[in-house]
Amino acid sequence: RRIAKVGVPSMLQQSIVSVSMMMMQGLVNSYGKVFVAGYTAATKIDTLAMLPNMNFSNAMSSYTAQNLGAGKRERIPLGFKTGVRLSFYATIPFFLLYFVFSRQMMGLFLGAGSTRAIESGMEFLRIVSPMYFMISIKLMTDGIIRGSGAMTYFVLATVPDLILRIIVANILTGRFGSTGIWMAWPFGWIAATLLTVIFYRRIVSGKFRIRI
C-alpha cells in the first residue's frame, strides 16, 4: 500500500508531463522547422541551468526524509533556507550567461547561418532565465515534498504548471505570435511555485503527517 501511495501519483504525474510536452511540441511545430530548431537548442541550454538545482532538490529530499524519520521536523526550514541560498548562488552565473550572452550560447548549438533559429532561441532564454530564481525555490520545496512522502502534493503542484502553460501559450500566441509560447513558461512556474510553498508550509507545520 505504501509503495502504491508513492508510485501511483508519480506515474500519473509522469504521464501528464508526457502528454503536455507533446501538446507543447505540437504548438512549437506549427511555426516551422526553423523555429523548432531554435526551441530544441534553447531547451537543451535551459536544461543545463536546471541540473545543479535538481541535484540540490534531490539532496533536500534525502535531508527531509532523514529528519522526519528522526523526529526532527523543526530542522527542515533551516535546510530549506540553506538549499535556496545555494541554489541562488548556482543560478546567478546561468542567468547572467543566458540573459547577456544568449546569442553566443545559441551559437554553440546552431551554425552562424541559422539566424532565425538563433533569434528564436535567444528570445526564449531571455524570457525564462530571470525566472530561474523562482524555480530554485520550487525545486527546493519539491525536494521537501518528495522527502516527506507527500506525492499527492507533488502531483497537485506539477499538473497546474503544465496545464496552465499550454492554455496560456495558446492564448498568447494569438496576440504575440511565437513569442507567446515562451511567455507561457513564467505563468506556469509562478503557479507551481506558489502551490509548492503552500504545501511546504503544511508539511513544516505538521498539518501533513507521514507515517514512517
Predicted segments — roles?
Residues R1-M23, L27, L48, P52, ...:
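Hydrophobic faces of transmembrane alpha-helices in multi-pass small-molecule transporters and flippases
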Residues R1-V8, T64-M131, L172-I212:
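Short alpha-helical transmembrane segments in multi-pass integral membrane proteins
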Residues S10, Q14, M22, G26, ...:
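Transmembrane alpha-helix boundary and packing residues in multipass membrane permease domains
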Residues S15-K44, L48, Q66, Q104-S114, ...:
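Helix-terminus/linker motif at the lipid-water interface of multi-pass membrane proteins
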Residues G38-S102, I135-G149, Y153-A157:
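Small-residue-rich hydrophobic transmembrane alpha-helices
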Residues M54-S57, V128-G147, Y153-R165, I181-V197:
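Short runs within selected transmembrane alpha-helices of multi-pass transporters and secretion channels
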